[in-house]
């Protein structure tokens, strides 16, 4: 079976996806009429506007990336505060999302970031308490989603590739993750959200 990396850029709050999703919400997602907004070898961009999902209108944008077509995923790093679109252009990316959390005044990551053995930033206690329960590990253009915690971060020794902590981790091995470590207000508050997933 083909392996796809799907990047979901939500102009919605994906709070209800794992908790509190109704049967109506499930059916709305299953029967959504996706519009293909762009397609080229290895990349398909889709969008759907839903009048009612999780008790309000939602717009969902999804990018499916097929690594078997030569597409690679990378964690882009840039100095200072720049828009995601500028960082994408610097790295010649075809698509990009803001992958983690950062200090809005200083521009540095507030989540663990390590590239090829060099620790660039560590996760703040506040972020661990609020939402950081996962990370993206990238090496040679391949992504792996992994659980993350303060204990894992303290012992993390891998020298090759890039790891970027973020969260919350939504699924692990096809099962919903425990969100009890996440601050409830973050989970319940509706904001635009982004998510990354891999499929087999």
PLM ranges: what are they?
Residues 1-26:
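Bacterial Sec-dependent N-terminal signal peptides
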Residues 90, 107-200:
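Aspartyl protease catalytic domain
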